[in-house]
UniProtKB/Swiss-Prot annotation:
Amino acids binding [4Fe-4S] cluster: 443, 509, 512
Record's keyword terms, sorted: Iron, Iron-sulfur, Lyase, Metal-binding, RNA-binding, Tricarboxylic acid cycle
Cofactor descriptive note: Binds 1 [4Fe-4S] cluster per subunit.
Descriptive protein name: Aconitate hydratase A
Subunit structure: Monomer.
Function: Involved in the catabolism of short chain fatty acids (SCFA) via the tricarboxylic acid (TCA)(acetyl degradation route) and probably the 2-methylcitrate cycle I (propionate degradation route). Catalyzes the reversible isomerization of citrate to isocitrate via cis-aconitate. Could catalyze the hydration of 2-methyl-cis-aconitate to yield (2R,3S)-2-methylisocitrate. The apo form of AcnA functions as a RNA-binding regulatory protein.
Class of enzymatic activity (EC top level): lyase
Length: 901
């Protein structure tokens, strides 16, 4: 039998007396399939992953050949991706860890070895999403906010802390340490792994998936990774692949360098604008060209972070000498850096600007010298505004038609004022365009010492000139790691930021994800009473309407330097390039140019205070550096003691009644239609993340468990409780089910009695009768966020199959991984064209002979006995997915496989 690609590609190299195994990309070139130098670097990383992990079942020669022929006409197919590690944040991480704990309990219930239930690849959870800015502009803000954070989240934190003791290969970075993507960049990422595989030291690229869309930040250091939904992350943890189509790769050729006055933030916002115009949704983006060498690694990370905003799967910068320089700066060892360079050179993945450019699907060019100081807003990150145009842009937006770039108000808005009477007796007046929130926030920018120290220098010059921030501006500084605090301190700049109210409020996402906390009551009242259009300026990555604060209607993304400058001005209705920010101590006007540092000032400051020693010191004890976390009372027992009275964390019912052997693929008979929907049903329609209504099934459940309405919290915060989440499935207040005409929200008709009732109530009645359910849908079913509960909830309601005209990629995959059969109408056919109104009994003639993308016969029996028959495509996209389905889902398959070992 001929050797497969894995065997052909296995090679060795020696470094410092040690031999390393690796899998050489040239193996595909030697077979005459492709020239490796023609492949984009991101595709090379994927190809290495396939070569090294080929097993002739999940990953085959065919996958390797298909990916190797990247860029060739008509080359389609899917790539199985098995990342080398997984990162989680606490919002999305809780349900993933709940599933692991539930797997353990299920293993114990059937007498299996519970130690077999552990992540198979390293998992790091960073707790960063829960801190809110309650206290600010004072020296005690950090401690006060952290205390409140622990009080609000104690049960969740107790659970996550227990998991660190219970599971191998799982670590949690405590609250008040940093933001997941910055901790990943500065500490967790190895760029190249060395692991013992079959007794050999094997080198291979660091790759990952993360349960947060901005996981792409790590692409800045040449590590391939992106955000996924929870089920896909769990699959990765348990050694299972995720699948995606062979991507197009758009090359962005960078030339020249940034001019004086322009920052990495300005460049990232410009890239977002250009790539949104280009259209890169679902594609890889890779940066190359002579301009790359003029970008420090921190600038690259800022650009890569915003890949979700420009719509790409990733924004990749291949590893080069600048990457190695950053590794040294952040305290990685010289020995490891030498290994990274040697391995990547040996395996044709080290970027050199002098080498021939790869072949990209398409190329666009960006001249860095044309970037200028900018903001984005008022409602979308891709809506770029040059600083010079900001005043006119804001004024135009006030009266522009309501939409992404307008508020639909009239000119009288500019005459509005709100008088504020502070509790200390002082007074202030807020006008249209005044700034309610100015936040230095988000890993997008706080990972970048150039813009952070730049902001500190702006603050220093402003304080020395005698400028102050108006009392109505809520100011905050929330860096993504403690290293930032260290270098601002060592540069002597933090006191100047403190003088302006930019005191440290926490280490976490804060304002960037909407955890901006309340404004002062007197300010909130004044804004609400006058219905005043106020603004925020933040160094974040998203500014959708209502995201930052419910009362703040216009939100602008900007560099930390501009956040400080606008806070001083107190309004966005100003031309900062030509109008004074304020008056100095001497009574003279002070302009932006008077407080803006030069490129040399910033660079000299960075060089003097950002050192390897600082990174080594701050990350030395990263998993145990928070006393409140260390004091959490948890047992070290390997099984989690689920509290039946908890409304946040419950043992999900996925494994109840699990048989020892998997099922077989059998016909589905007598199904009733629970939902009939049109096009573009999103995962948010299927599983909302927001507020829980008091009269909904989920609201009634919480009230039955003595939870006051004011403490309902959101569906998102209760993702660890399947009882809440299943009641919230198809419960979005805006979903329209054609089976309950005249209603909006989660209602259906229960056919045995023709009653209209909540979908959850009907589903439970069908379950009592032993009746399976079906959902009929149009195009793009499951589009939007990769929300795992959209598939989990569908499963728990008893839905056996969804028949849609087309699916969004991740939701289709999630349905299979939850044991729900995705069927697709033939092109040109739909429920309506076939005359299906939802009253029918549905049967699907499927059995073990089916193969991926086969057509099966579906029969719909009308109430009068007439039959409608049609063919539907089985949307299993691989043989592995058929196994998931036989087992009832990926978690059930993992459990049975572990039992069989």
């Amino acid at each position: 039998m001929a050797a497969n690609f894995k065997e052909q590609s296995k090679k060795h190299f020696d470094l410092n007396g040690q031999s390393y195994t690796y899998y050489d990309l040239k193996a595909v070139e030697e077979q005459g399939i492709t020239k490796v130098s023609n492949l984009p670097y991101s595709i090379r990383v994927l190809l290495e992953s396939l070569l090294r992990q080929e097993d002739d079942f999940v990953i085959t020669d065919d996958h390797i050949k298909a990916l190797s022929q990247f860029g060739k006409d008509g080359n389609e197919g899917e790539v199985p991706f098995k990342p080398s590690r997984v990162i989680l944040q606490d919002f999305t991480g809780v349900p993933a860890v709940v599933d692991l704990a539930s797997l353990r309990k299920a293993m114990d219930d059937v007498g299996g070895d519970i130690t077999k239930i552990n992540p198979e690849v390293p998992v790091d959870l960073v707790i960063d999403h829960s801190v809110q800015v309650d206290s600010y502009a004072n020296p005690e803000a950090l401690e006060r906010n952290m205390k409140l954070e622990f009080e609000r989240n104690y049960e969740r934190y107790q659970f996550l802390n227990w998991a660190t003791k219970a599971f191998d290969n799982y670590n949690a970075v405590p609250p008040a340490t940093g933001i997941v993507h910055q901790v990943n960049l500065e500490y967790l990422a190895s760029v190249v792994h060395v692991r013992d595989v079959d007794g050999e030291k094997t080198a291979f690229p660091d790759t990952l998936v993360g349960t947060d869309s901005h996981t792409t930040m790590i692409n800045g250091i040449g590590v391939l990774g992106w955000g996924v939904g929870g089920i896909e992350a769990e699959a990765g943890m348990l050694g299972q692949p995720s699948y995606f189509p062979i991507p197009e790769v758009i090359g962005v050729r960078l030339v020249n360098s940034l001019p004086q006055g322009a920052t990495a933030t300005d460049l990232a916002l410009r890239v977002t604008q250009e790539l949104r115009k280009k259209g890169v949704v679902g594609k890889f983006v890779e940066f190359f060209g002579p301009g790359v060498q003029h970008l420090p690694l921190a600038d690259r990370a800022t650009i890569a972070n915003m890949a979700p905003e420009y719509g790409a799967t990733c924004g990749f910068f291949p590893v080069d000498d600048e990457s190695l320089k950053y590794m040294k700066l952040t305290g990685r060892s010289d020995e490891h850096i030498a290994l990274v360079k040697e391995y990547l050179k040996q395996n044709h993945m080290f970027f050199d600007v002098e080498k021939e450019d790869p072949n990209y699907t398409d190329v666009i060019e960006l001249d860095l010298s044309t970037v200028e100081a900018s903001l984005s807003g008022p409602k979308r990150p891709q809506d770029l505004i040059f600083l010079s145009d900001m005043k006119s842009s804001f004024e135009n937006s006030v009266t522009a038609p309501a939409g992404n770039q307008g508020h639909g108000l009239d000119k009288s808005e500019f005459d509005k004022k709100a008088e504020i009477n502070f509790k200390d007796g002082s007074k202030a007046t807020m006008k249209t365009g005044d700034i309610a929130i100015a936040a230095i926030t988000s890993c997008t920018n706080t990972s970048n010492p150039y813009v952070m120290l730049g902001a500190g220098l702006v603050a220093k010059k402003a304080v020395e000139k005698g400028l102050k921030v108006p009392e109505y501006v809520k100011t905050s500084l929330a860096p993504g790691s403690k290293v930032v605090t260290g270098y601002l301190r060592d540069a002597g700049l933090q006191p100047y930021l403190d003088d302006l109210g930019f005191n440290l409020v926490g280490y976490g996402c804060t304002t960037c994800i909407g955890n901006s906390g309340p404004l002062l009551p007197e300010i909130e009242k004044a804004i609400a009473d006058e219905d005043l259009l106020v603004t925020s300026v933040l160094s974040g990555n998203r500014n959708f309407e209502g995201r930052i604060h419910p009362l703040v209607k216009a939100n602008y993304l900007a560099s930390p330097q501009l956040v400080v400058a606008y806070a001083l001005a107190g309004t966005v209705d100003i031309d900062l390039q030509n109008e004074p920010i304020g008056k100095g101590n001497d009574g003279e006007d002070v302009y932006l140019k008077d407080i803006w540092p030069s490129i040399k000032e910033v660079s000299d400051t960075v060089d003097s205070v950002v050192t390897p020693e600082l990174f080594i010191e701050e990350y030395n004890n990263v998993y145990n550096n928070n006393e409140l976390w260390n004091e959490i009372d948890v047992t070290d027992q390997p099984l989690y003691d689920f509290d039946p009275n908890s409304t946040y964390i419950q043992n999900p019912s996925f494994f109840q009644g699990l048989s020892k052997e998997p099922g077989t693929i059998v016909p589905l008979n007598g199904l009733r239609v629970m939902g009939k929907f049109g096009d573009s049903v999103t995962t948010d329609h299927i599983s909302p993340a927001g507020a829980i209504g008091k009269d909904t099934p989920a609201g009634k459940y919480l009230q039955d468990h003595q939870v006051p309405i004011r403490e309902f919290n959101s569906y998102g915060s209760r993702r660890g409780n399947h009882e809440v989440m299943v009641r919230g499935t198809f419960a979005n207040i805006r979903i329209k089910n054609q089976l309950a005409p005249g209603t909006e929200g989660g209602f259906t008709t229960y056919w045995p009695t023709n009653e209209v009732m909540p979908i959850f109530d009907a589903a439970m009645k069908y379950k009592e009768d032993g009746t399976g359910l079906v959902v009929l849908a149009g195009n793009d079913y499951g589009m939007g966020s990769s929300r795992d509960w959209a598939a989990k909830g569908t499963n728990l309601l008893g839905v056996k199959t969804v028949i849609a005209q087309s699916y969004e990629r991740i939701h289709r995959s999630n349905l299979v991984m939850m044991g729900v059969l995705p069927l697709e109408f033939k092109k040109g056919e739909s429920a309506d064209s076939l005359g299906l109104d939802g009253t029918e009994e549905i049967s699907v003639n499927i059995d073990e002979n089916v193969q991926p993308h086969d057509y099966v016969k579906v029969t719909a029996k009308k109430q009068d006995g007439d039959l409608v028959e049609f063919d539907a495509m089985v949307r299993f996209d691989s043989l592995v997915e058929m196994d998931y389905y036989r087992h009832g889902g990926i978690l059930q398959m993992v459990l049975r496989n572990k039992l069989a070992q």
